[in-house]
Amino acid sequence: RAYQDGDDTLARRRQIVVDYLDTVPLAARPGMGEVHGLGDGLWAWYGRDFREVNRLLADNAEGAAAPTPEALQRQAEAFKQVLSLMIAQRRPSQHLLGDGTGLARLTDSYLRLMAEAGLIAPSLRDAALPLPLHLRPELPSTPRPDFVQRKATVALRTHISALLDVPRAYDLERLDLEAETSLDGEAQALASRLLAGLRTPAAAKAAGLFGPHMLDPGADPGPLIYSFTLFERGPQANLLRVQADNIDQPFDVNQGARLDLGSTAKLRTLVSYLELVAELHASWAGLSPAQLSALPNNPRDPLGAWARQYLLRAKDRRLAPMLEAAMERKYSANPGESFFTGGGLHQFENFERSRNSESMTVREGFKHSINLVFIRLMRDVVRHRMFGGASDAESLLKDPADPRRREMLERFADREGSAYLIRFYRKYQRQSAAGAEALLLRGLKPSAPRLASVLFTIEPEASEERLDELLTQRLGKGFAGSPRALRALRTTYAGLSLADRGYVARVHPLELWLVGYLRRHPGATLSEVLDASASERQEVYAWLFKTRHKSAQDKRLRELVELDAFAEVHRSWQRLGYPFESLTPSYASAIGASGDRPAALAELMGIIAGDGVRRPVQRVDALHFARDTPYETRLEPRDAGAEQVLPTEVAATVRRALVQVVQDGTARRLKGALVDANGRAIEIGGKTGTGDHRYGHNGRGGGAGAERKISRSATFVFTIGDRYFGTIMAYVNEPYAARYRFTSALPTQLLKSLGPQLLPVLERGGCGGD
């Protein structure tokens, strides 16, 4: 490129020098960032204006008129400062971040050398040498706003990092980038300030947070965490307007944790139920009565049986009336039944015990958040996935010769064996060989057969002398094993299968295998253990594959069929924004056992409020790079495309149920709480949920043992009018959780307090325009 204009490259070489001077790195300063180029360097380190310095140096150029003594002093100071920066670029941090004495000494030395070489006039040298180099003092540090005030900013920066695939904050900071966001700045600041203030009793009292099912009189509101997320439905995307919490840490409780949000899971369960009804309608609504009657009738699928009977009787076969009829199906609220689910027997309770004897519709159960109604509803959903539609699980369970049984039993053995190995690995992973052996034998009632079974599993090549040593150590000196007896023990127990050695030792055979494997492969990872144990996991369940154990097989096959049914439920939840890669395979998922995130619940509410359409969440309206430069670029979001993920009729049915929760259900304190500019009540819908996360275990004899309260949460996921939706949550973690008994009354009251303050700000800020 230097020769594009001919052989004379002087101009190009000068430009290269200018480009270098404009980009030379000159360390960094707090409050300013990295310093590049002489212009920024003069301002950052000496407080000088670049144009003024250039003018002074031009006035001193060769051929210029002789300066006055005052002008010479100014020119000398400017020249010395520029020269010092050119020297400092060798080691900018060393020269510019220290006390400056070394830099001054080097600069004076170069002034003398340049004068001797005739590069500068002696008068300029003599004027510059006495002048001190005063590096500009650091700017007074401005107090950084706390994390509460910067929460949305931090979340947006993280989002932008992901959009640009720039994972390091350091690299993001180096971009000349402005981001235009969908956040309403005034509403965001107001919400952050209000939530932060709730840590004081006075502010909590002013918001009405003390009272039944909220904060007890005298309770300390300080440990409570509040979060609030508000979206607005736009034409192409759901726009984030407010994202705030009062955690003074970078952690974002709206998106960063898996929380027990209690009965908000009933919303997901209701949607799954109505989706199934819509699927059955799509399959059967066009059939004649004779065709409907000819459909197979499985007594294990009550939902399919109801749908068939409804369509046989219905005069109006449209989907909307069928969904309304599905909301009127009745379930018992009786907690007396035990439910076999998730591989175990479970019992559940209602929050309102006065409802225990009632039988109520799905609509009433949702409105009043009755646990047992939704446990039974989830059971019907799962059973339909197990035995209804195209499922052939019934024949699998009935026919012992079905070849699929063997395949599924092998899958069960692999799954359950892996679960045991994971547990055993955690127990032994940090133990030495001797420590693992001692831990294994600690709970073992010693006998010669048991000890021999253990030894020849963990140490297959053990000698009879080693066996004698172990028996003497564990059985005492009274044991005197003859060589013949030791040989007999070795012959008998070393030759047993892994499962039989575990049976003799009264230790799970995979635990024995793991201790032996870790002895031979110290430091093995869990992944290596699982890879190495594939055949052993099948071997220890060999008894299960024998046809005489059909009842045991059926029990485990039902567990797997249920697991597959929950996998289908999980896929439907994920399609509607459920954020996790697994779902707890238990009816308890209907009341919150599987966890959720406030942001994910808000997305589900956006789908419901948007007539079943899933719109992308938009946090950033535009990214503007290098403004007012030749490289200026502006990027705006592409239309990601909305997707119809729920039938419109399903969304409308759920929306009506949500409104009834506020009109006459668990969130009725919000009825009429918000009004528009004309004084008309704004319609609010939502679902409440209270999560009480505890850890406990049974005591001796199956009685209640120790219990630890891990956390408590109360959540309200809501819609406001036709445009706004979101979540509001109160949360407290251990060690404070045991002090509080609040329910979802707390966040609903908080929304009642916040809403009238926030909505006018949002409307004034122009939110809501299409």
Give names to the regions the model predicted.
Residues 1, 38-41, 125-147, 177, ...:
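Acidic helix-start/capping segments at beta-turn-to-alpha-helix junctions
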Residues 1-196, 230, 378-380, 385-531, ...:
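Non-catalytic, structured segments within soluble enzyme domains
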Residues 24, 28, 49, 93, ...:
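A generic secondary-structure signal for well-formed alpha-helical elements
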Residues 53-54, 160-171, 235-250, 340-341, ...:
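Active-site-adjacent bridging/hinge elements
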Residues 181-230, 238-255, 269, 313-327, ...:
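A penicillin-recognizing enzyme superfamily signal
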